Amino acid sequence: LQPLFEYTQQSVKLVFLEETIHHKPDTLLGIFKKGLQFGHSSGGASILDLHSGALSKGERFVNIFTNPETKNIWSETELASYIDAKETIRRAVIENFGLQLEAIHLTSPTFFSRMTDNPAKTVHDEYWHPHVDKETYETFHFTSLLYLSDYGSEFQGGRFVFVDGDHMNRTVEPRKGRVSMFTSGGENLHYVEKVTQGTRYAITIAFTCDAQHAIPDPHVRN
């Protein structure tokens, strides 16, 4: 893995263009779009969690797995692509943060996101506020993002911004297949700019050092 961007001060932030998952973004986006057939937010931010089944629908969340029409909508091949992308990123976090092989585990919530310029209907649509991941999700130790669409050509706005203590923001422009990874604590305050046009797709893949908070990979539900 060759870092496309790297900055080290009180924290480490890394952005990669990961060639080994270059062919997977379209497959992963297809997985998400299948889920969106069964619901999406009435505001600007929709999510799908393949592990818990959480899906945005209107101004609330539903469990997609309780809908009999969703039985077997994702094939073993699709889920294998998702798991492979997750594992590639997990190993990249291990390598670049100097961790032991089994030091981190996938944790909840890990989810697809879709952001548009629709006005917010609930607080869950207001993704643009500066925040710290570990304050929002206590189980997070490392956060990674895999982008599934291109800034500039498929959407405007929606860049990822680190708010650093030296009063200088550092901005990541999403590109399909690009991966960013960072520690989830207060050293990495950040926000996402409002999407002003088009649709921004990504996956948040979260890792914990506490095996008690590990979650299993998704599987075909019969």
Where are these regions (language model features)?
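Fe(II)/2-oxoglutarate oxygenase catalytic core
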Residues: L1-F182, G186-N222
